[in-house]
Amino acid sequence: MRKLVAISLAVVMLLSMIAVGVGCDDGDKEITVGNKNFTEQYIIGEMIKQLLEDRGFTVELVPDLATDLLRGGMEAGDIDICAEYTGTAWMVHLAHVYEPGVDNNELYDLVKAEEADNGFVWLDPIWNNNTYVLVSWADFAADNNLVSLSDLAALYNAGTVEVKTFVGFEFSTRPDGLPALQEHYDFSVPEASLMTGAPGASLLGLENHDCDVAMAFGTDAIIAEYGWHTYQDDLAFFPPYDLVPSVSQAILDEYPEIEDILNELAATFPGGGMAATPALVAQGQAVWQELNAKVDIELMEPEEVAYEYLVANGLIDG
């Protein structure tokens, strides 16, 4: 009797172990994806999340992170995957000075090589150059004969008119942001004329005519929507900011299939997996302006936009 009970208990324990084991196989494929706190990042974060979930992963998405917090999460191993920008990595994370004239391909190669030494694998790039830009209403630029950032710098320095300027708080302090821009173009925004706020607040400020000059990103849909003037970066201050999935080497060692999965995503964008050209980069910016417009102008949710894109490009079933 004791032997029968012991056998029965052993069978129950074995079945329990099998059941738990099966559950662990699914649960073991757990990935944490992080994204920053603006529209484009919400969309790419959802794209990565939904695509990996479709391929059998359990994904936790950690949104709304500032650049330093996202990087800290990657370095601590709390976040496995993010989509970072080449210019941000080169100047902020790797603390290099950008040399004007380094193109999209060169900068990607430099970042990829150095990040490999830090334990991060940079996969195929998405050529969209979401670089910082300064914009104004077209009539303000026309009235003051402004075309380039050099023209704008001269207007600041002349002091004949107040140029109310609105930039993101992070941009106002980061090493590749406003302080370096002012030094490069040799101008200064008076403290009384400078406003800072959360990402997107500068666009709202310009839309409402609360400022004359606002910080934007190259893929912001609202620029085309309102026909705003974008100041030419005639002294080549801003480095390329191309979007690239970055994966922890440790998680890629465990799940090497992630590389092919995310490279499939990059391949759906203009020039994905190929060397960048100005034409391909411009096409990529246009694609992302449209995607961002679906959220910022059509008021769709980022997860809807991501799902729609993945289905339309055959990456997941509808």
Predicted stretch roles:
Residues 17-31:
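Sec-dependent signal peptide cleavage junction
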Residues 30-64, 127-204, 300:
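Bilobed "Venus flytrap"/periplasmic-binding protein-like clamshell domains
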Residues 50-51, 68-80, 95, 179-184, ...:
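Short helices/loops that flank or line small-molecule/ion binding pockets
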Residues 63-67, 77-90, 107, 199, ...:
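Beta->alpha turn/N-cap motifs
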Residues 93-123, 210, 222-236:
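Ligand-binding "clamshell"
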Residues 132-142, 241-256:
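A bilobed periplasmic-binding-protein/Venus flytrap-type ligand-binding module shared by bacterial periplasmic
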Residues 172-176, 180-187, 263-318:
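An extracytoplasmic/periplasmic, membrane-proximal ligand-sensing/linker region
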